[in-house]
């Protein structure tokens, strides 16, 4: 599947948000790249909406065409379109693996899923965009559990803080999805209403 593979720090600086998680280079220079990076530029309404859409795309590692499909589905669902969109993105398998503490970044989680290291409800899933459901059980494949990465992750999971809608069992590297997240439980710096306004034009 196509995905953005360019310099993450530069993209973070342009959108003024840490897209990676723990990006020290961004923390040192949290302003857009280039000579005019520190300058305060008057931003149009359209630019703000576009930036928010791009921010969501790059946080979750979603290409434009797929993101548009997410929005269309979110718009068809009952409730607030923006909140529906964020919940759908947060429910991606790669994001759940990241939130559970089995990967340092969403990009790494996407790679781990793509390489076939996880099973959902007993069935192998290697699609990062696979959306989990309430009561799903996610396990690391038995062969994969012997990898150095998962052995190290297992030690770190004991003290890991995970979202309330998930539960992690460190001894078995199991993730339990107690419920789908509510918007208030999703701690990303995103103004999803601006995305709704962008697509409503």
UniProtKB/Swiss-Prot annotation:
The keyword RNA-binding applies. GO terms for cellular component: small ribosomal subunit. Residues 91-151 form the S4 RNA-binding domain. GO terms for biological process: ribosomal small subunit biogenesis; translation. Signal peptide: none annotated. SMART domains: Ribosomal_S4, S4. Keywords: Ribonucleoprotein, Ribosomal protein, RNA-binding, rRNA-binding. One of its GO terms (molecular function) is structural constituent of ribosome. InterPro entries: Ribosomal_uS4 (IPR022801), Ribosomal_uS4_bac-type (IPR005709), Ribosomal_uS4_CS (IPR018079), Ribosomal_uS4_N (IPR001912), S4_RNA-bd (IPR002942), S4_RNA-bd_sf (IPR036986). Part of the 30S ribosomal subunit. Contacts protein S5. The interaction surface between S4 and S5 is involved in control of translational fidelity. One of the primary rRNA binding proteins, it binds directly to 16S rRNA where it nucleates assembly of the body of the 30S subunit. With S5 and S12 plays an important role in translational accuracy. HAMAP family: Ribosomal_uS4_B (MF_01306_B). Belongs to the universal ribosomal protein uS4 family. This is Small ribosomal subunit protein uS4. It comes from Corynebacterium efficiens (strain DSM 44549 / YS-314 / AJ 12310 / JCM 11189 / NBRC 100395).
